[in-house]
């Protein structure tokens, strides 16, 4: 008879995974990994930390909700005789709930770029939007110049039209706050259903409005120390260029956003990240590869890459 592993949603940030003690030990090992560059960190050198991050807490039975797919992978692995049992939470529902989004609203959007020219979302953008809304979360991986901000704008547009809670967009730098805001201003210049005045920018040096708007764009540095009560107003969160966030700060913010049902991360790459891939997927959801630079170049949607190698030979006395 298979051993049961019960999974229940604690909130939109965390889930409770419970089973027999021996299984929990396996789960702990499964969700444990070394931090890149841990050998050079003071805590490791001083022998107060072993260099590992343990995502599963066997004491509280808590695990990031975005890692449910990995729990399924663990349970269904060859050689294991485990059975997943999903428990319902009266407020948060089941961990694997999906929706069937109606994307017909996109046809009615009047979108413009920064030059004022009319634009339409591309096929790969529409597929990414469908995936994200269907799962209510996702880590969208798409290269530079692929239109990530347009994907965010359309997802945000849908969310504001179907929900009452506010939306939070987190970026790593102040320049990206302004870039995101200017992109939204361009997209919505002929979109009567989106009011750019309802978008507030928060970063060091910019005063906070007394009345909270529908959308806030902020650097993570400006908000990660705020109390948990401040984050309760948000039902949706976006993390743009999420790979540039510091793991501890990002984790602090996303776990405080326990009532944010919709969680979307975007990034161009998961290589050389400051935050481990499993942490990002745990906080936002499973990785989804939107498109590639090669595909965009093949379709002439991106300038062709021309590589020229310059080989410089120096005399020995200069080397």
What is each stretch, according to the model?
Residues 185-228:
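Inter-Walker segment of RecA-like/P-loop motor cores
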Residues 159-166, 188-192, 261, 288:
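Post-Walker A helix-loop "phosphate-sensing" segment adjacent to the P-loop in P-loop NTPases
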Residues 1-90:
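N-terminal accessory nucleic-acid engagement/regulatory domains that precede
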Residues 52-55, 83-141:
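Conserved pre-motif I regulatory segment
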Residues 169-170, 201, 265:
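Structural beta-sheet core signal
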Residues 215-253:
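Conserved RecA-like ASCE ATPase "motif II neighborhood" in helicase/translocase motors
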Residues 146-186, 250, 272:
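Conserved Walker A/P-loop ATP-binding site and its immediately adjacent core
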Residues 235-236, 243-308:
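Post-DEXD/H (motif II) to motif III coupling segment of the RecA-like Helicase ATP-binding lobe
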């Amino acid at each position: 008879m298979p051993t049961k592993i019960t999974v229940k949603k604690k909130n939109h940030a965390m889930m409770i995974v419970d089973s027999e003690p021996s299984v929990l030990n396996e789960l702990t090992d499964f969700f444990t990994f070394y931090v890149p560059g841990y050998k050079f960190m003071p805590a490791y050198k001083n022998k107060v930390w072993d260099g590992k991050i343990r995502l599963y807490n066997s004491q509280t039975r808590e695990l990031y909700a975005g890692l449910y797919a990995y729990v399924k992978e663990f349970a269904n692995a060859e050689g294991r005789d485990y059975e997943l049992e999903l428990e319902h939470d009266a407020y948060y529902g089941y961990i694997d709930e999906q929706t069937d989004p109606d994307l017909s609203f996109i046809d009615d959007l009047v979108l413009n770029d920064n030059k004022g020219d009319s634009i339409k979302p591309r096929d790969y953008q529409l597929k990414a939007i469908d995936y994200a809304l269907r799962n209510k979360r996702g880590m969208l991986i798409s290269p530079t110049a692929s239109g990530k901000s347009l994907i965010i704008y359309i997802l945000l547009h849908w969310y504001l039209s179907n929900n009452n809670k506010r939306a939070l967009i987190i970026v790593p730098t102040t320049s990206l706050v302004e870039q995101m805001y200017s992109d939204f201003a361009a997209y919505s210049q002929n979109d009567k259903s989106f009011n750019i005045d309802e978008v507030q920018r928060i970063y060091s040096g910019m005063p906070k409005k007394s009345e909270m708007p529908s959308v806030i764009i902020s650097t993570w540095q400006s908000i990660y120390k705020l109390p948990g009560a401040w984050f309760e107003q948000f039902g949706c969160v976006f993390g743009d260029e999420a790979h540039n966030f510091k793991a501890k700060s990002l984790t602090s913010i996303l776990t405080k956003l326990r009532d944010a049902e919709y969680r979307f991360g975007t990034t161009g790459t998961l290589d050389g990240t400051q935050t481990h891939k499993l942490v990002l997927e745990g906080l936002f959801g499973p990785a989804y590869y939107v498109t590639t630079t090669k595909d965009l170049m093949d379709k002439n949607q991106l300038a062709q890459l021309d590589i020229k190698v310059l080989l410089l030979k120096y005399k020995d006395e200069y080397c």
